[in-house]
């Protein structure tokens, strides 16, 4: 049996997302917000995987030879479920499950914070990265690489320009090291990379690549600032202790916010 495009991405994220959820749970714990890691991990992975699971069920129904009756039954059920109903259903079930796990403490203090923290983890680490899978299902792996290159080049450009020319602080109370010069330099770097990448994608004009790079560069840096906000609130410098990187969340922060923007840009251009 063959598997849908993006299987490698799906399996990689199915491993990485629980690690990121664990780091998010630790950040929330610093603020005395206790969430169920198990509930949030399972829910985040399901929300992230739904486009791939939908495609897998279609392929299984189109080529059922060798599949077990149970697999066919599950694929048939999944195929009848509208995807835009599945994610809200998972989130609602996760909310009930998280509050149910919280009630085992036999305390009411922090129930609303638990609910909010659980949904934050699921949306941030399940729904947002899930946009990369429909992109991969409709485009080549090179498209995913291009998106990540634009986002990460914005990070590197912001760091380099900020170090060389940074004078005016961007948001000193949130991220003292970031400057307006670095912010603009990072966006410009992503725009240049986006224009250059169109050389390998003839279906896009250079100006479309430039606009995509500029927008994804902005989103990537906003994603970095969003994670800085969470870490500042928790009172920590890094989300984890991965040598040389900090934590899994520190690696994912910029690509996460860029994912839905990239998806809708491609929908606008290609339909």
Model segments located where?
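Hydrophobic alpha-helical segments of membrane proteins
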Residues: 160, 187-196, 218, 222-229, ...
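Membrane-embedded alpha-helical bundles of polytopic integral membrane proteins
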Residues: 1-214
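Interfacial loop-to-transmembrane junctions
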Residues: 232-255
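Transmembrane alpha-helical segments of integral membrane proteins
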Residues: 100, 222-237
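Juxtamembrane boundary at the C-terminal end of a transmembrane helix
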Residues: 264-271
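Membrane-embedded alpha-helical segments of transport systems
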Residues: 154-157, 184, 249-259
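Hydrophobic side chains within alpha-helical segments
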Residues: 26, 158, 227-230, 253-256
